[in-house]
Swiss-Prot record:
Protein name: 1,4-alpha-glucan-branching enzyme
Lineage: Eukaryota, Fungi, Dikarya, Ascomycota, Saccharomycotina
UniProt keyword annotation of tRNA-binding present: no
Family (UniProt): Belongs to the glycosyl hydrolase 13 family. GlgB subfamily.
Organism: Candida glabrata (strain ATCC 2001 / BCRC 20586 / JCM 3761 / NBRC 0622 / NRRL Y-65 / CBS 138)
One annotated GO molecular function: hydrolase activity, hydrolyzing O-glycosyl compounds
UniProt key word Transferase: yes
Site entry: Transition state stabilizer: D488
Top-level taxonomic group: Eukaryota
Self-association state and partner proteins as the record states: Monomer.
Role description: Glycogen-branching enzyme participates in the glycogen biosynthetic process along with glycogenin and glycogen synthase. Generates alpha-1,6-glucosidic branches from alpha-1,4-linked glucose chains, to increase solubility of the glycogen polymer.
Amino acid sequence: MSLTKIPENVQGAVSIDPWLEPFADVLSERRYLADKWLYDIKHATPDGSEQSLVDFARNAYKTYGLHANQQTKEIVYREWAPNAQRAFLVGEFNNWNEESHEMKHKDEFGVFSITLAPLENGDFAIPHDSKIKVMFVLPDGSKVYRIPAWITRATQPSKETAQKYGPTYEGRFWNPPNSYQFKHQRPKFNLANDSIKIYEAHIGISSPEPKVASYKEFTQNVLPRIKHLGYDAIQLMAIMEHAYYASFGYQVTNFFAISSRYGTPEDLKELIDTAHSMGILVLLDVIHSHASKNSEDGLNMFDGSDHQYFHSLTSGRGEHPLWDSRLFNYGSFEVQRFLLANLAYYIDVYQFDGFRFDGVTSMLYLHHGVGAGGAFSGDYNEYLSRDRSGVDHEALAYLMLANDLVHDLLPESAVTIAEDVSGYPTLCLPRTAGGGGFDYRLAMALPDMWIKLLKTKQDDDWDMGHIVHTLTNRRHGEKVVAYCESHDQALVGDKTLAFWLMDAAMYTDMTVLKEPTLVIDRGIALHKMIRLITHSLGGEAYLNFEGNEFGHPEWLDFPRVGNNDSYHYARRQFNLVDDDLLRYRHLNEFDAAMQNCESKHQWLNTPQAYVSLKHEVDKVIAFERNGHLFVFNFHPTQSFTDYRIGVDVAGTYKIVLNTDRAEFGGHNRIDEAQEFFTTDLEWNNRRNFIQVYIPSRTAIVLTRQM
């Protein structure tokens, strides 16, 4: 294929996927928009000098909002509010006086500012952790009170305050006398060479007790578990401040504030620093796809207008049709400043190592992936046709800039993940090739497949070819995070894999004091096999939601009116793993063995596996990846002796992982000391074969001895 007629800025993408050639001009236009914005940002300085994207983002979070100068003891506050006529800083520091601290009149861009000199005794004019708001006078003369848009601390009101004034969150001036000092270097991560295994976690539910757990409890109690399991990254959910706990963190009100339910900003810094000391990366589940409709404690109607940060409500683009939330106007320069600064802030101030971008499908399309527009078939016209795709070019351009920024800030450790169900081509190709710049996308079809199998098919009817196709159906050159279940499957109304497999028997039959029932025996065996085949065949990275590694027995339901504000299901029962008399520890130890086996033998971040066998009658799947041989026998009753498995490289093979070990809840039917010698005869299109014993519902991983 000749690239001479392909626009230079997307030649890399087309060389990776020649099917993109008819759409090269569209791809080029989309990249050009992001590059134009980048040019505008670099030249948006008062003196006309050039600034980097990193400088732009850092200067923004260091300029806007409230900032205390530790040397001069001055406090400077800046706020962009173009619709407001006047602005006043009010709070406990001035007894909520509406007149005493008027901000300087907005400049030509709509920015108000005020500088507060220190008190006569040399203290800051605003005490640390005291309540604060900004009051705007609108064009019609009315007044509105808002939490500053760039606030770094917001808290729930006391019961007495809530009863009197409502549950609106309270902004606070965070300026601790002794801020946390990071002690440990970030772990390095090289996308080209390193594997990544991600533990998805929610701080508030990370306790067996029915309560909101804390950052400190997570640091002390959960981080050591994650380290033991062998995960090398944590993805923290529901960190950005959200007034409604039951929203799972997806209705963000205060973008620069971390959730105060779990503790202080210094507590979160300690958590991340401790994770780094263990060699664990920490990723933030970042919500830039939408925002809460709250106005008094959120961004909505912040300066009295409906279109400051968001598309106008009259435009048809200002609200999400399903989420009851506001949608950002990514084409606005000030919105770009706000969101890009938000990313830089979390990287610099909290030392996050990257982001999982939530709701990317909703961002990418004007139809938000809802209704007929969300029925993606894989036809390239659905993504790249000028007439049919419905792509939001501005949102895509913002995501490109976001990836540029994160990788510029963290050249040795950045990780960006897109939650995209649509399969948008080039999303996870490098920006230099004309792609979106993400490192990974979530393989969202995989959990759907497993749930559908368990809901609708008997074990004898499992289609091996369909399983393999779904696990390997991903775009060449674009990495995916494989997972068989995440927080989505744990939510009330759905079931975890363990619950689909064992249901109510998990409450009565998980004891080791009696022989496992048929239901429990099947459930434990398939739970391990599903996780291992997803891990080894489904992608270039792996993700697990907290508790699912040991088959957490219950769904996740946050306290709300519908459940009488109960915390009973808003917790993770780690006590089940610690009980030696329960079989949950078997699943937990298998998960640890699987993660640590991958760390030692490295199969995730390697080329796609070669699948040599998908036997529908025997229910056997075999494949090779990075020199390792994986064999799965999904047959419910049939074990096979001297079963021939094709293998490309001759030599002696030994088992390095076996799901049937007793400590993993298995039956110890396999002799792991045995060596397997290849026979120099072609089998299943491989140059050699070995013969193995594979019991029913068992998987083994073999590695050639060097």
